[in-house]
């Protein structure tokens, strides 16, 4: 049993866990019924620990005989009316987040005890003999943890030891707080052995360079601790190996990532040519935006620009300093990405536009971006994220920025000269490659590399990242691999990402662990959950109403099963989910249901001709009788009645005749075996969407979009179509939708073409079991 909304095809060529085909809907309906009926709040954690995007958990079993309507709509009105209090909370959260986005400056970031200690170790450059930044020592003394250590709330041995060594050295150097030093030394003694077993993937950036100098400093200060553990010896060996690989001439002449960890060369300071290195300073006076590296440079040179950078930080953060600053581009790009993936970006469109304008101002089509503006060094992580969010928000960016990261073997490195790969950075490269345009070969190669890398890591159960400790990175990667962006419906993606997003519990791995509160924010998560549940309650109410429409029209008597009705409504709700788009959503679902009903009639050629004659006659009679078609054909009458109500309920202008014209084109194509479904759905969405443009249908770009979308959806029905052709057409459609030009169509109108194409792709890509699981999660399983 297949639904004409999509195709019943089997094509092993296209990627995914199953061949592209439409699911058998009766099996799907029984599965959804069972899971919806068996769901309870105690099972709300289902899917949070793994992707589950295409394979439901063990709790999902097939049963028969349950009444889906009864199990899912009881108490819906009560839920809707009880959300009045949540609306106030939603409004409060929206205003709070808008304030965050409007006031973004250099970037919000947690303090680094390690970097603060390096700044605290700087002696008065005027020769006073004391610390030049005494407030840093106050910060250190005020931020010691109960166990005697310094560091992030997440206990990571690398992080706690490097922070604690640095802080106890700073305090001991200035003979301050001996009691705090004693507690810190006790912590070090008790935890040094844990270096032996810590996972290397959790080792902070440059740890093998930055930790040994602290160990040697501590020894010179007669701080006693065990220094013969296998883990420590291994770190020293890694340092020796890295030193042998350092291109000393290059690091003195061009900016490299070594500038970020210059303090790690404190034991070999005599090999550093500061006259050359200071020429590589960032415009703000820092060494690659690192307070610790800049503090070491200030110790060695007394440079005025280094001093000014550190003075600004100490004053800005009241004595503490972060491990990286500024991070203005990173904060804006990542925050926008999080809001979009959580499904709440519509509340912040003006603020997102400003964030994107800011990032685009510093974007280089040749080099990409780094976390901070004006950087002479770029990385693939920030470049990938910046590229994706800029392109999806309509900004002109070139993929040439990725060329510098590709090596001779076709692998993509995060930094030029890097020797190992990051899961999260490669994941973001993969996500950037998803939005490629036709002919962008560098992105095609990036997609090939990143797909294989991530698939291999998943197969080996090695989706542990060296740059971030997040709630469910394996789930994020799994979803992206299993559900390609072309097939990812907005509400499905939001549902999974809300469960994967860690909020303020996420820690990033720099030289120490750090937090980015404007990227990982509990308010984002709370708003996403509230909004999701509010939308879901409305969707459940609509599902009840569309069932009543189905019964009143007698569509069951024409062979339309309730399973097909559910699938039609789910696809519409998962694609066009916003409360204010209820009319569009219902119009799409009803149109799809009617199309399914008509095409399942198995009519002869003559019967089809009679149907069209009734349709044409009904149009004439409707015009003559003021809206009453007067036809004897029940299905034709249902079309006219439904179209009439759509026109009354969903638009500020009269769209009745335009909707009927769209239907007329469809029935004419249907009579001769044509395929006009996609065009009918697009026209229905755009007409019921209340476009401010009364006649966009004559626009040249509208016709282009319609042609490509129709071709894509038609291909997804053919069993012989090549994957490369579908991908090429999807790339062309994405380009038409996201690029802007003078005299262009409204972006909301263009997006509807992509919405329809992605819905066809989704239905062809995902298995019956997966779609059933998604229906439950999107429509019936409440977020807690």
UniProtKB/Swiss-Prot annotation:
Transit peptide: 1-57
Keyword Ion transport: no
EC top class named in words: lyase
GO annotation, cellular component aspect: chloroplast
Enzyme Commission identifier(s): 4.2.-.-
Swiss-Prot/TrEMBL keywords: Chloroplast, Lyase, Magnesium, Metal-binding, Plastid, Transit peptide
Pfam families: Terpene_synth (PF01397)
Compartment(s): Plastid, Chloroplast
Tissue expression: Present in both leaves and flowers.
Annotated substrate binding sites: 242, 466
One of the protein's GO biological processes: gibberellin biosynthetic process
Highest taxon in the source lineage: Eukaryota
Residue window of motif DXDD motif: 379-382
Associated pathway: Plant hormone biosynthesis; gibberellin biosynthesis; Secondary metabolite biosynthesis; terpenoid biosynthesis
Gene3D superfamilies from the UniProt entry: 1.50.10.160, Farnesyl Diphosphate Synthase, Terpene synthase, N-terminal domain
List of residues binding Mg(2+): 379, 381
An example Gene Ontology molecular-function term: terpene synthase activity
Cofactor(s) needed: Mg(2+)
Functional note: Involved in the biosynthesis of labdane-type diterpenoid including marrubiin and other labdane-related furanoid diterpenoids with potential applications as anti-diabetics, analgesics or vasorelaxants. May be involved in the conversion of geranylgeranyl diphosphate (GGPP) to ent-copalyl diphosphate (ent-CPP) and 8-hydroxycopalyl diphosphate (LPP, labda-13-en-8-ol diphosphate).
Record remark on domains: The Asp-Xaa-Asp-Asp (DXDD) motif is important for the catalytic activity, presumably through binding to Mg(2+).
Sequence similarity: Belongs to the terpene synthase family.
Annotated protein name in UniProt: ent-copalyl diphosphate synthase 2, chloroplastic
Organism: Marrubium vulgare (White horehound)
């Amino acid at each position: 049993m297949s639904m004409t909304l999509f195709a019943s095809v089997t094509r092993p060529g296209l990627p995914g866990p199953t061949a592209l085909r439409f699911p058998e809907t009766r099996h799907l309906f029984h599965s959804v019924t069972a899971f919806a009926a068996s769901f309870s709040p105690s099972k709300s954690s289902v899917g949070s620990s793994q992707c589950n995007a295409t394979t439901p958990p063990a709790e999902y079993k097939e049963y028969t005989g349950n009444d889906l309507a009864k199990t899912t709509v009881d108490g819906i009105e009560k839920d809707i009316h009880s959300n009045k209090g949540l609306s106030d909370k939603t409004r409060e959260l929206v205003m709070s987040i808008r304030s965050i986005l409007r006031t973004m400056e250099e970037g919000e970031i947690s303090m680094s005890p390690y970097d603060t200690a390096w700044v605290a170790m700087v002696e008065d450059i005027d020769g006073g003999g004391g610390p030049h930044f005494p407030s840093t020592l106050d910060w250190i003394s005020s931020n010691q943890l109960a166990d005697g250590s310094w560091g992030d709330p997440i206990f990571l041995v690398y992080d706690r030891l490097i922070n604690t060594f640095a802080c106890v050295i700073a305090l001991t150097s200035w003979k301050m707080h001996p009691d705090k030093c004693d507690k810190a030394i006790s912590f070090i003694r008790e935890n040094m052995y844990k270096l032996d077993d810590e996972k290397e993937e959790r080792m902070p950036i440059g740890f093998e360079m930055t930790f040994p100098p602290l160990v040697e400093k501590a020894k010179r200060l007669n701080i006693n601790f065990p220094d013969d553990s296998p883990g420590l010896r291994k770190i020293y060996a890694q340092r020796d190996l890295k030193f042998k690989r350092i291109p000393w001439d290059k690091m003195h002449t061009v900016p490299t990532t070594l500038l970020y960890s210059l303090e790690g060369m404190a034991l070999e300071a005599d090999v550093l040519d500061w006259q050359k290195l200071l020429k590589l300073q960032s415009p703000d006076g820092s060494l690659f935006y690192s307070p610790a590296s800049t503090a070491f440079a200030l110790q060695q040179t007394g440079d005025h620009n280094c001093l000014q950078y550190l003075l600004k930080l100490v004053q800005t953060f009241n004595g503490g300093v972060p491990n990286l600053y500024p991070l203005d581009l990173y904060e804006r790009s990542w925050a926008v990405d999080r809001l979009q993936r959580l499904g709440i970006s519509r509340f912040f469109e003006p603020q997102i536009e400003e964030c994107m304008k800011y990032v685009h101002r510093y974007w280089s089509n040749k080099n990409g971006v780094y976390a901070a503006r004006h950087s002479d060094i770029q990385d693939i992580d920030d470049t990938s994220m910046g590229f994706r969010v800029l392109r999806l928000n309509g900004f002109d960016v070139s993929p040439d920025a990725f060329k510098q990261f590709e090596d001779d073997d076709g692998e993509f490195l995060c930094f030029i000269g890097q020797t190992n790969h990051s899961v999260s950075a490669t994941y973001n490269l993969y996500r950037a490659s998803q939005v490629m345009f036709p002919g962008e070969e560098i992105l095609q190669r990036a997609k090939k590399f990143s797909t294989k890398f991530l698939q291999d890591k998943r197969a080996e159960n090695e989706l542990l990242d060296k740059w971030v400790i997040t709630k469910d990175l394996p789930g994020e990667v799994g979803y992206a691999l299993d559900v390609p962006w072309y097939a990812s419906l907005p509400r499905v993606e939001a549902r999974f990402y809300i469960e994967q997003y860690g909020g303020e519990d996420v820690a990033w791995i720099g030289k120490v662990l750090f937090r980015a509160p404007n990227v990982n924010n509990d308010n984002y998560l709370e708003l996403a959950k509230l909004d999701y549940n509010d939308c879901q309650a409305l969707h459940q109410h609509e599902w009840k109403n569309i069932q009543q429409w189905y019964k009143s029209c007698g569509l069951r008597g024409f062979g339309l099963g309730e399973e097909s009705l559910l699938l039609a409504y789910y696809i519409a709700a998962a694609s066009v989910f916003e409360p204010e788009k209820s009319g569009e959503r219902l119009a799409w679902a009803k149109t799809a249901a009617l199309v399914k009903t008509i095409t399942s009639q198995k009519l002869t050629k003559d019967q089809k001709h009679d149907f069209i004659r009734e349709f044409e006659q009904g149009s004439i009679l409707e015009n003559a009788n003021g809206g009453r078609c007067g036809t004897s054909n029940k299905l034709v009458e249902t079309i006219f009645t439904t179209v009439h109500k759509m026109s009354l309920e969903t638009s500020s202008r009269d769209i009745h005749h335009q909707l009927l014209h769209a239907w007329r084109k469809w029935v004419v194509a249907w009579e001769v075996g044509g395929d006009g479904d996609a065009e009918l759905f697009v026209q229905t969405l755009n007409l019921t969407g209340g476009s401010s443009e009364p006649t966009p249908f004559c626009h040249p770009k509208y016709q282009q979009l319609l042609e490509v979308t129709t071709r894509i959806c038609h291909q997804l029905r053919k069993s012989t179509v090549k994957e490369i052709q579908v991908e090429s057409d999807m790339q062309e459609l994405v380009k038409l939708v996201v690029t802007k030009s003078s005299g262009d169509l409204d972006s909301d109108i263009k997006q509807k073409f992509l919405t329809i194409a992605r819905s066809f792709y989704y239905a062809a890509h995902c298995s019956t079991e997966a779609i059933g699981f998604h229906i439950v999660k999107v429509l019936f399983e409440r977020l807690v």
